[in-house]
Amino acid sequence: MSIKENSYFAGGVKSLGFNQQGQDVSVGVMLPGEYTFGTQAPERMSVVKGALIVKKAGEVDWVTYNTGEFFEVEGSSSFELQVKDATAYLCEYL
């Protein structure tokens, strides 16, 4: 078992990845900014503290997810994020 450290977007997003009972998971923090992520497998993003403003690939509307809320993204897709304040998240790879 190991912990994988990741840094994206010049340090604007940092995460720690691990495997729990056969499921890949990462937890991290996003600083204010705009980010686009691609997915290989389906993902569930839960907001631990803060808010993420999300637009999934192929959709027109931006949706805000606050502390305690989550959204799911299909595999082989992408999503855009707007982050107004530093936000902690949990990403589960489904």
From Swiss-Prot:
GO terms under cellular component: cytosol
MF annotations from Gene Ontology: guanosine phosphorylase activity; purine-nucleoside phosphorylase activity; thymidine phosphorylase activity; uridine phosphorylase activity
Reaction catalysed by this enzyme: a purine D-ribonucleoside + phosphate = a purine nucleobase + alpha-D-ribose 1-phosphate; adenosine + phosphate = alpha-D-ribose 1-phosphate + adenine; cytidine + phosphate = cytosine + alpha-D-ribose 1-phosphate; guanosine + phosphate = alpha-D-ribose 1-phosphate + guanine
Keywords, in A-Z order: Glycosyltransferase, Transferase
EC class: transferase
Key word Amino-acid biosynthesis present: no
InterPro entries for the chain: Ppnp, RmlC-like_jellyroll, RmlC_Cupin_sf
Any matching Pfam family: Ppnp
SUPFAM superfamilies: RmlC-like cupins
E.C. designation(s): 2.4.2.1, 2.4.2.2
HAMAP family listed in its UniProt record: Nucleos_phosphorylase_PpnP (MF_01537)
Role of this protein: Catalyzes the phosphorolysis of diverse nucleosides, yielding D-ribose 1-phosphate and the respective free bases. Can use uridine, adenosine, guanosine, cytidine, thymidine, inosine and xanthosine as substrates. Also catalyzes the reverse reactions.
Family per similarity comment: Belongs to the nucleoside phosphorylase PpnP family.
UniProt-listed PANTHER family: PYRIMIDINE/PURINE NUCLEOSIDE PHOSPHORYLASE, PYRIMIDINE_PURINE NUCLEOSIDE PHOSPHORYLASE
Name of the protein described by the UniProt record: Pyrimidine/purine nucleoside phosphorylase
